[in-house]
Amino acid sequence: MEEGSEAQPPLQPEAVSAEASEPPPPVPMDQDEGQAAAAEAMEGEAEGAAAAAGTIEGEAGYAAADADPMEDEAADEAGAAEPMEDDPPTSSAPSATAAVDDSTIARKRRRRKKQFPGMIPTAGVRVLRAAASAPSAAHLNGVPRRRGRPPTSSSLRLARELDAEALIALAAGFPADSLSEDEVAAAVLPRIGGVDQTNYLVVRNHVLALWRSNPLSPVASNAALASIRAEHAHLVAAAHSFLSDHAYINFGLAPSVISLPPCPPPSLPPPSVLIVGAGFAGLAAARHLMSLGFKVAIVEGRLRPGGRVFTKSMRSTAAEYPDIAAAADLGGSVLTGINGNPLGVIARQLGFPLHKVRDKCPLYLPDGRPVDPDMDARVEAAFNQLLDKVCQLRQVVADSIPHGVDVSLGMALEAFRAAHGVAAEREERMLLDWHLANLEYANAAPLVDLSMAFWDQDDPYEMGGDHCFIPGGNSRFVRALADGIPIFYGQNVRRIQYGCDGAMVYTDKQTFRGDMVLCTVPLGVLKKGNIQFVPELPAQKREAIERLGFGLLNKVVLLFPYDFWDGRIDTFGHLTEDSGQRGEFFLFYSYSSVSGGPLLIALVAGESAIEFEKTSPAENVEKVLETLRKIFSPKGIEVPKPLQAICTRWGTDKFTYGSYSYVAIGSSGDDYDILAESVCDRVFFAGEATNRRYPATMHGALLSGYREAANIVRAARRRAKKVDSPKKMDVNNEVKYEVKVDNIDLDDLFRTPDAAFGGFSVLHDPSTSEPDSISLLRVGIGARKLGSGSLFLYGLIMRKNVANLAAMEGDEQRLSTLYRDFGTKLVGLDGLGDSGSSLISRIKAAARK
């Protein structure tokens, strides 16, 4: 995938290469503390948090590298206006010039999904209030719970505090008046219901609100107890433990959070976890597991972290414009809904400014004329009515047919359109096609492929608040999240094998062994079957992988010498005469105000996104320029040649095979849950396609990583409670593995090594002292302090080379020399081969004497 950068046609823009030229070696040292600049609060958590139960779908998320999409593209912010999921642009025509007329109607960009009546409770948000009668010692009731508050304090103020805290919890994804599924699974209370549950919910909401009020400083359990009565200390401990384990509090990249010492691991030696994929899900899980005392390493196929979140630096090579440059998000690009969004918390911790997406989105006819405002409003209303008709139809089907029936959303919409004579005129039909293309953009799929019954199943969980962009691109998140995490780049995973004694990850270069594996690869990779699971995954999971859809969205990114389209708008749309090409360059985003340069991005959705990859990049760029000329030439505005152009190719990217997930015909939200299920407490799954509430979003991927980190912790604790025994265990009722028992622990032997320097330690062959004899090398990867939270990898090295390694300055130089000069590969113990096994046997035999 090469990127094109020539200013004159023929341009050679191909899907940009997301890889670095040389994979950085794993860093076996102390984890650096990420610098986090404190910023003003940007998240009005409680303010409008009720929208979390409403409809603002936070959308697309992941994004791509190389062109990994997961296009979170949705909304722009101060400049890159990508549409917001939930509501489609609603604007009227622009003025005769490129400038935006004040009369232009605000168009909510990016209709992801429509919120239908009855999909969420209509009685409003239910919050916990103080009991008005018979105060008891057990209740957090009308008696002030804040210590030191005068007894004359108004109970109304307490009720308001409880309401505000419940709204914050709601925005973070918790039920307002019941335990979440995760809380039930974690057994936060001995029994469900009753007084303890009521009080626990108030305490949980309070602890969460304390954290969200100041995420720059961790919330300690005793700090929460300072404002809660002592008799409820057990509830504070339960809530604090749950929220910490699941990264609802004390997560992120604030210096005070990073500097916290790791928690004691559930067992010794600490459990080890191999994570496949360094996207948002993998990075979030790795960082959280390390904070909980686990040994962690990430295996990544690309030569960079981030997965489908990738910011490409674009720069002019033209002599007359030497200083023009911009940062372009080729994949996920928008924070969709800031209330409750963990990325909003991390942005605040790092001091990243957030830019609200502007709503105006003028539309243009194929000949460049602006769309008539009255017709625009009329057709949009008709479009919404069509969606309402589909909603009514599926309700009738659900009520009348026991097991329901699923058909194509596109087919249902077209049937109602034809039956009611909607958009019969030519221009009306073009405008309706634009709205349909916008819907295809939101779902990364042609409407004909979407499930009529469940395509919008995640609407009730949308996060409220503004849709925002991060100036400079979302790779700023990636760099901060990846800092200090051991990542092995350029490792294409071929097989994941698991049994009762652990799991192994086989790449085309090395073999890794751990206690558990977390797989975060995109759904497109799972669909291709490029990774073999041994034993085979359960049939239910394989069927869910088959049923769920994984769609496609592409972009054409253009760096111009100057902004000719008027930076006062973030988005503008273009209508097409051919319904079959309605998704081709239907929406443009201006990133001028957030990218650092005059950057314009054209979106390609639906069937057009598929056809786009069959056409050469140069031809696609010329098509975009022709479209822009039709819009701006009638206004007397010349469209200059781009200084650099990039076309994404998400569908053919071997690390994604698409952009992000959608609910296909025959699928449902249940399939997201099935994908999230672990196998034998050894193999776990994360990523946007495992998040039923927030699929196709960056925050959905991040949250899934935190979720699985908590599940891994629970699994490790369960395992630690069991007494080790040499029993056989069934794995999927198919394959049996024998637990290995060895009365000599290699970890004990490495406590007194023959040589130790930095993160390296060595055991020599006890049967010989020849310089050319082989020694066993162990490297601690990702240790804050050697032996604490580190993952150990092994290699074979000649005894005479040990002194050379020890004399070098720093472990990075040692690793580089190890790979380049000595040809030593670092692997798990089982990857050392016969020579390694024989050497270990001799070392252990000598230790027994």
Swiss-Prot record:
**Named cofactor requirement(s):** FAD
For this protein, the record's SUPFAM superfamilies field holds: FAD-linked reductases, C-terminal domain (SSF54373), FAD/NAD(P)-binding domain (SSF51905), Homeodomain-like (SSF46689)
Name the InterPro entries on file. Answer: Amino_oxidase, FAD/NAD-bd_sf, Flavin_monoamine_oxidase, Homeodomain-like_sf, SWIRM, WH-like_DNA-bd_sf
Q: Where is the composition biased (Basic residues)?
A: 106-115
Record function comment: Probable histone demethylase.
Q: Which organism is it from?
A: Oryza sativa subsp. japonica (Rice)
EC top class named in words: oxidoreductase
Q: Which family does it belong to?
A: Belongs to the flavin monoamine oxidase family.
Q: Where is the composition biased (Low complexity)?
A: 34-67, 89-103
Region Disordered: start-end pairs: 1-118
Q: Where is the SWIRM domain?
A: 159-260
Which residues are FAD-binding?
A: E300, R302, R308, E688
Mind listing the UniProt keywords for this protein, alphabetically?
Chromatin regulator, FAD, Flavoprotein, Oxidoreductase
Enzyme Commission number, as recorded? 1.-.-.-
Q: Does the keyword Flavoprotein apply?
A: yes
Question: Could you give a GO molecular-function term held by this entry?
Answer: spermine oxidase activity
| A single BP term in Gene Ontology | negative regulation of DNA-templated transcription
One of the record's GO cellular component terms: nucleus
Protein name in UniProt: Lysine-specific histone demethylase 1 homolog 1
